[in-house]
Regions:
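Cofactor-binding beta-sheet edge motifs in enzyme active sites
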Residues: 2-204
């Protein structure tokens, strides 16, 4: 089986794989193309010849009109130094219902990476501009103070699998869901620890 991908001479135009849609779009396209090939083979009575069969499928997933979402819950324990205003993450647990998980290892790493981005938004990262020139004062990764794995504890990720997904084998969107909850979870933990509700990010 030869898969044609990443060739702009042979593949249709695509806006790229982003927005947590790689598994859904690519996975469904592969499944549908293979199903078409299987149908062609069945129509020819399972021949043993050297003919080449070509199966195609749309990269746009089709649904029955039902909106399906992934659901998540994050728990975070923080330590706040009220003297100098710093916050340290002590424990982080993320529970995600993302349909059927096709590759648990990469799915967990996606959730961890997205969660670290969300923690960075909550505690460190800021986009500052010079009020006179309008030029950014935090260009690049270094000045923006992006978090690294050394800055956060191990993030415990648990998946609750259901067969309600519209993707291949019941998969759902998962990649970016961790970044949505993390800032709110951290802000709520800081508010619970200090009694002060934060209304802007980063929390300082």
């Amino acid at each position: 089986v030869e898969v044609v991908w990443g060739d702009t001479d042979r593949c249709p135009y695509s806006v790229g794989e982003s927005g947590s849609r790689t598994t859904i779009q690519t996975g469904l396209a592969v499944v549908q193309a293979v199903e078409e090939l299987r149908s062609q083979i069945a129509d020819q009575g399972m021949p043993n010849g050297g003919d080449v069969l070509i199966g195609t499928a749309t990269p746009v997933p089709t649904t029955d009109g039902k909106t399906r979402q992934c659901f998540c819950a994050h728990y975070v324990e923080v330590e706040v130094d009220t003297r100098i205003g710093t916050t340290r993450i002590l424990k982080y647990t993320a529970v995600h219902e993302s349909g059927r998980i096709i590759n648990p290892t990469t799915a967990r790493d996606q959730i961890r990476g997205a969660t670290i981005q969300g923690i960075g938004q909550a505690l460190h990262e800021d986009l500052l501009y010079d009020s006179d020139s309008g030029q950014p004062l935090t260009p690049g990764y270094y000045r923006a103070r992006h978090l690294t794995h050394q800055d956060v504890p191990d993030i415990d990720v648990t998946f609750i699998e259901v067969d309600d997904g519209y993707g291949p084998f019941g998969a759902k969107t998962a990649g970016e869901s961790g970044i949505i909850l993390a800032p709110a979870a951290v802000a709520n933990a800081v508010a619970n620890a200090t009694g002060n509700r934060m209304t802007s990010l980063p929390i300082t």
